[in-house]
Every structure is written in C-alpha cells, then in structure tokens.
Amino acid sequence: LYAGVGGFGFTAAQAGAGSVIGVETSDEAVAAGNAAAAQQGMGSVEFIAADATQWVREKPAPELIIVNPPRRGLGPDLPGWLNECSAERIIYSSCNPTTLARDLAAMDSWKVDQARLFDMFPQTPHMEVIALLSRI
C-alpha cells in the first residue's frame, strides 16, 4: 500500500513472494511500476491506481502487507482495517516517526518485532524507520 513505483514490491517478488499487488494513487507511478515489471519479466507483480483505504475494503487481505505512507501516515481509517484483516505480518516503512508512533498506537492487535532507523538524509531532521509487525 502506498507503493510508489514499486521498490518494496520488486524486492518482495525477487525474495519469492508468490504475487505482489502495489496500490498507489499516482497514475504516473503505477504506469512506471507496471512498465518496470514488464521490462523485468515479473508477471507476478501488478500495480493498481487506487486509494489504499478503499482498495483494501474490496479485496481479501494478503499474508504480508507492506505500507509506505506519506509523511501524514496511514490516515484515520486504515489502522482499523489492519487491526481486523487476516494478514499475518506488516512491514511499515515510515518517513515520519511521529505519525508512525500514532499509527502503531491505533493498531493494537499488532506488535513491533523489529525496527530500524535509517539516517538517509544526513544533516537534516528527516529519517526513515522500518518496522516489522506481527499479530499479538
């Protein structure tokens, strides 16, 4: 969810994920992701232009969900769906530790198993955090 041009999705596919669906609101990012998948011969990777919160309500949950939301975080509705869905794991990539903490507090059926902070923008206050979540 919030797939961008597919960096996490391609990595998951290369690691052996059976199928990967990337959901992104940007038509340009979806087109770029689908073009890259075709160019790399990754038929199991597909990108869809849709709102993440709306899309998840219409589809069955996968075993693993990767979310990479914008700085504003997951929004008010997606954490509730994540609490109720049947997914076994979540990888949460965040560019804003404050909204990550807020979203995790709203996801009370999940626990953080591992987390890493990445200082990808030295000399700035910006950082990336990756958290691996599992069911409580």
Q: How should these model regions be labeled?
A:
Residues L1-I136:
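Rossmann-like S-adenosyl-L-methionine
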